């Protein structure tokens, strides 16, 4: 994914740049990386990771969560990410727009606005062109 490490991904979603991600940042990160995870599972994961109850998850806890996600998906995170990318890339042009993200998330039953999807895209848009790309898809 543009050669991004877990720490790069964490930093992209740490919009407040305080070294921790809030529930909203966590939810957006996991949904962007693994859209098939149900909301109830996300809440459960966040509660388990937020061991001190401060409503924040640090980079180490986030990495642990991603490792657990990889193990539960059979260990092939890259394949899962590629499959998720293809799901969101509605017009198959190799990039995901905020509108495509909104359409798919709405179909998956998520209540979100186009504006919130613009924010999610901006959070992980590597080159600032308004799209998410997955190199090698």
Swiss-Prot record:
Q: Per its UniProt record, what Pfam families does this chain match?
A: EF-hand_1, EF-hand_5, EF-hand_7
Instruction: From the UniProt annotation, give the residues forming the signal peptide.
Output: none
Q: What Gene3D superfamilies does the record point to? A: EF-hand
Ligand binding (Ca(2+) 2):
89, 91, 93, 95, 100
Q: Which residues bind Ca(2+) 1?
A: 14, 16, 18, 20, 25
Which residues does the UniProt record annotate as the domain EF-hand?
Answer: 1-36, 37-72, 76-111, 112-137
Q: What molecular function terms (GO) are annotated for this protein?
A: calcium ion binding
Print the keywords alphabetically: Calcium, Metal-binding, Repeat
What SUPFAM superfamilies does its record include?
EF-hand (SSF47473)
Establish whether keyword Calcium is in the entry. Answer: yes
What this chain does, per the entry, is described as: Potential calcium sensor.
Q: What is this protein identified as?
A: Probable calcium-binding protein CML33
Which species is listed as the source? Arabidopsis thaliana (Mouse-ear cress)
What phylogenetic lineage does the species belong to?
Eukaryota, Viridiplantae, Streptophyta, Embryophyta, Tracheophyta
């Amino acid at each position: 994914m543009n050669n991004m490490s877990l720490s790069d991904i964490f930093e992209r979603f740490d919009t407040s740049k305080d070294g921790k991600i809030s529930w909203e940042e966590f939810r957006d990160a996991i949904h962007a990386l693994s859209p098939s995870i149900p909301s109830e599972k996300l809440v459960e994961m966040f509660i388990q990771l937020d061991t001190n109850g401060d409503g924040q998850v640090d980079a180490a806890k986030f990495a642990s969560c991603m490792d657990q996600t990889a193990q539960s998906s059979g260990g092939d995170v890259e394949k899962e990410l590629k499959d998720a990318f293809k799901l969101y890339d509605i017009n198959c042009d190799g990039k995901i727009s905020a509108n495509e993200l909104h359409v798919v998330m709405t179909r998956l039953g998520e209540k979100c606005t186009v504006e919130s999807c613009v924010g999610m895209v901006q959070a992980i848009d590597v080159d600032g062109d308004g799209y998410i790309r997955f190199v090698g898809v």
